[in-house]
């Protein structure tokens, strides 16, 4: 989500605190899970050429996952990104990408007969994200509207998994997975002046479509054998809704405080996030 949530708007530096929580429903093959993420993102962007801007960002987030049945995972995530836009009158073209390094720790309990094991693993992984987007401004005296189309590609690769703890420990070689999603939607914002403070309200409603296979597959094997088998995740939903809402408060000519909510809702997954940020223009 990070790559498609950033775009260059004004000359300045910005900081954003974020929190995210999600739920995935299980099926006959895999149990559901709960996730939570918190962290901070920092960025700097400015004008590069006429009606064009470029920005860089970095940040740290930590994700926790509870899979039930005494299984959990934690991931420390380090982000680096580049993004920008170019305007042609009312038409805006945006693009960007991020690269994330993960340090993942997993733990699960295995109970069979009189045996009880606690299997643990620590491994590294990487995620690359790219997005392109176009939007068209429709402005009147009351509200600004922007229909938009967004296409995002995500590629994930782990550096191998090697559990330890008992006879049921698993291992896996380096593996990668990819996903592509498009979003069609409408953004709206309006603003007014309250005494010496400028206030803006913004919202977004979109339809997101996932391409390709909906299940993510990992090939694993028991540590003492070479017989591999596939483990499938809970499938993502083919289609879902994207919701966003926020408020920006310009406390002076240089500083803007923001508070926002984002949600992705589908039949199998519910994902919610809140963020608070500050932009300092120069």
Model-derived regions: residue spans:
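Short secondary-structure transition/capping segments
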Residues: 97-111, 147, 235-252
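Beta-strand segments within the central parallel beta-sheet cores of soluble alpha/beta enzyme folds
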Residues: 58, 96, 146-149, 200-204
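Solvent-exposed flexible segments
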Residues: 134, 145, 150-156
């Amino acid at each position: 989500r990070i790559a498609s949530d950033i775009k260059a708007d004004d000359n300045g530096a910005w900081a954003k605190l974020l929190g995210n929580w999600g739920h995935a429903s299980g099926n006959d093959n895999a149990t559901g899970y709960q996730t939570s993420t918190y962290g901070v993102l920092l960025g700097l962007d400015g004008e590069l050429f006429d009606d064009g801007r470029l920005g860089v960002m970095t940040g740290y987030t930590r994700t926790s996952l509870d899979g039930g049945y005494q299984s959990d995972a934690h991931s420390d995530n380090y982000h680096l990104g580049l993004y920008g836009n170019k305007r042609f009158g009312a038409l805006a073209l945006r693009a960007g990408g991020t690269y994330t390094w993960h340090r993942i720790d997993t733990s699960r309990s295995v109970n069979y007969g009189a045996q009880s094991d606690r299997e643990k693993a620590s491994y590294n992984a990487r995620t690359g994200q790219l997005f392109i987007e176009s939007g068209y401004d429709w402005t009147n005296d009351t509200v600004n509207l922007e229909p938009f189309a967004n296409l995002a590609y995500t590629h994930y690769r782990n550096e191998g998994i090697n559990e330890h703890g008992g006879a049921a420990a698993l291992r896996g070689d380096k593996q990668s997975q990819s996903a592509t999603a498009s979003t069609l939607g409408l953004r709206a914002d309006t603003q007014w002046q309250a005494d010496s403070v400028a206030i803006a309200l913004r919202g977004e409603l979109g339809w997101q479509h996932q391409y390709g296979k909906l299940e993510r597959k990992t090939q694993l094997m028991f540590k003492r054998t070479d017989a591999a088998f596939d483990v499938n995740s809970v499938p993502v939903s083919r289609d879902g809704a994207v919701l966003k809402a926020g408020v920006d408060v310009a406390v002076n000519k240089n500083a803007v405080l923001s508070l926002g909510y984002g949600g992705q809702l589908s039949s199998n997954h519910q994902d919610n996030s809140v963020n608070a940020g500050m932009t300092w223009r120069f």
